């Protein structure tokens, strides 16, 4: 099961440091570098989650998370711990991931820059997955046309 996550900063005007059309991703600010570090660390921390794709934008982050199968099985092949296969459990695991991510980042930032809520979307099929991968990949290009984009 895969989920697409959007986490906003709550900072409406946080321009990138370079023209996004000249690079595959906007140059990361100090905040972006810290966010990148914790996305990678938390990817290793959560047993049932892997970060498949992500992009750090000037005022938000998109993540595509994959819920992994539990490899901790009993002799008869049953899971020892519940695998997040239903929607409620999947959203709970993602909420934990996002909450931990924001807490770690905010501690290092010395301030809270994240919006309280985030948006999630359960990936329903292969086409839905590919659409979200494409969206994440193309998001830096679309940023140039965003109403919040500003040039320095």
Task: Give the location of each predicted region.
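Short catalytic/metal-binding and nucleic-acid-binding patches
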Residues: 1-152
């Amino acid at each position: 099961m895969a989920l697409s996550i959007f986490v906003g900063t709550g900072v409406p005007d946080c321009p990138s440091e370079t023209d996004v059309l000249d690079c595959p991703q906007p140059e990361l600010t100090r905040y972006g570098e810290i966010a990148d570090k914790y996305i990678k660390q938390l990817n290793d921390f959560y047993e049932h989650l892997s970060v498949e794709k992500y992009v750090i934008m000037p005022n938000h982050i998109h993540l595509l998370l994959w819920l992994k199968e539990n490899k901790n099985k009993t002799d008869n092949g049953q899971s020892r711990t519940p695998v997040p296969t239903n929607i409620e459990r999947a959203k709970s695991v993602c909420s934990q991931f996002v909450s931990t991510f924001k807490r770690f980042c905010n501690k290092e930032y010395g301030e809270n820059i994240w919006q309280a809520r985030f948006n999630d979307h359960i990936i329903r099929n292969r086409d839905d997955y590919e659409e979200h991968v494409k969206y994440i990949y193309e998001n830096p290009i679309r940023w140039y046309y965003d109403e919040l984009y500003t040039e320095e």
